[in-house]
């Protein structure tokens, strides 16, 4: 049986009959990961402590309900944390977390190109969309790192390895939108993750981007992320490292 399989595979490499499916490749990939997302939702939704599924209409302000739940559940108001946000944009979420955490020893790091998306996203947004100025916050605990994550994160992690390897809880906010940026960032952060760290995804249910990156990260690194809270039909989703 194995010989037959190998023969057929090699034959298809020589006679590329599968090219007839090439125009539908993107659709097949989307359906594959969308079904993976559906399966994940139906098997994991019961594990969430807070979840609004199913909501017929998404509401932007629901993300703050998610933040508020995470803040209260983990008692983060006065806890020292290291907050890392990937995809700052105008800084709305970044500002929310810096304002709601009162510990003066906390540190807040925001990563973004501030020049918009580095590539097209989701069929609706083009390269360069969502550009913004670097936010100006009156808080000396905050620092913004401008540039592609692929260019800035490795150096940052090397220079701050002691801080990130400490027992201080890390709150990681993934708002990069793109698969490429999310997958890269999670892989680089893996050595620094410890039990109790929190990871938020801002576009989790986008099947070919943040969800795909999450799925590959948990499978490839054998890491367990405990579901905590979700709003807007899992568009914004929070996990804790187990």
Model-identified regions with their sequence ranges:
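Conserved SAM-binding loop and adjacent beta-strand
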Residues: 54-66
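HDAC/HDAC-like amidohydrolase catalytic core signature
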Residues: 4-11, 15-19, 71, 75, ...
């Amino acid at each position: 049986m194995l010989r037959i399989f190998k023969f057929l595979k090699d034959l298809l490499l020589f006679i590329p009959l599968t090219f007839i499916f090439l125009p539908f490749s993107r659709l097949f990939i989307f359906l594959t990961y969308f079904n993976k997302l559906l399966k994940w939702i139906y098997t994991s939704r019961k594990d969430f402590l807070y979840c609004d599924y199913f909501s017929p209409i998404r509401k932007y302000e629901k993300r703050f309900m998610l933040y508020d739940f995470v803040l209260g559940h983990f008692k983060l108001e006065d806890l020292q944390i290291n907050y890392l946000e990937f995809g700052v944009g105008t800084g709305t979420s970044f500002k929310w977390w810096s304002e709601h955490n009162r510990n003066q020893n906390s540190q807040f790091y925001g990563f973004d190109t501030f020049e918009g998306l580095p590539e097209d996203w989701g069929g609706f947004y083009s390269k360069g969309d969502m550009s913004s100025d670097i936010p100006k916050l009156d808080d000396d605990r905050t620092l913004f790192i401008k540039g592609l994550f692929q260019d800035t994160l490795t150096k940052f992690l090397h220079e701050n390895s002691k801080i990130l390897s400490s027992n201080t809880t890390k709150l990681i906010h993934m708002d990069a939108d793109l698969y490429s940026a999310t997958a890269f960032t999670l892989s680089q952060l893996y050595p620094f993750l410890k039990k109790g760290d929190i990871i938020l995804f801002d576009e989790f249910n986008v099947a070919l981007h943040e969800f795909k990156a999450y799925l590959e990260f948990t499978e490839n690194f054998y890491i367990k992320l405990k579901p905590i809270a979700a709003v807007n039909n899992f568009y914004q989703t929070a996990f804790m490292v187990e």
